[in-house]
């Protein structure tokens, strides 16, 4: 299906739609890497593993998805999570990274980005979808400032980010995860400045400011909780 605004629409995911998103993510990954031997047992293991992660992080996350207007199926997705600095992130388990290694001094807000994939069935100008998904996901970290975006990221995606003027820092050696060479990285919120400013005119929507308010409320709750613990 060709990419046009007449064929697709951007929206956000409800918690009840998580199984649909995880299925889309795994199937799209399998198709991208042409995994003809992807067994039912392997799919079930991956599905349950990712569902477990997303159920833990859903309430402090926003999932941006692209859906078809024709049959409402998901064709692209990305997740941005406001991290509480306590719950173990996927990157920590995969790369054996201690929490202390991620808590960089003088950084207030910590984020995790994931579930980023665009269906290969979309033809045409896919760069517009890419920019929109990234803009929505990165707008919160950019606006709240003093932030660090953490991710386990496919090497090709890291290279794409660099082409979009988004630099990243590699935390360790790559591994093969979900069939691709995956790097542990972080992106400082100030490194998002060029990308956000360059795309603000074409990508900013009212919904982005609504999302900012949600993240501000999360930040306030986490700050209050930490003071109560002290």
Segments (PLM) and residue ranges:
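Conserved beta-strand in the GNAT
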Residues: 65, 72-82
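Acyl-donor binding region in acyl/amide transferases
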Residues: 91-168, 172-183
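Acetyl-CoA-dependent GNAT
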Residues: 80-86, 105
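Active-site beta-strand termini and strand-to-loop segments that position acidic
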Residues: 66-69, 187
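Terminal substrate-recognition subdomain of acyl/acetyltransferases
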Residues: 1-55, 142-144, 148-230
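Residues in well-ordered beta-strands of folded domains
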Residues: 79-81, 114, 186
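Short coil/turn motifs at secondary-structure junctions
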Residues: 83-85, 121, 158, 190
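A short helix-loop-beta-strand connector motif used in the catalytic cores of GNAT acetyltransferases and
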Residues: 52-65, 86-88
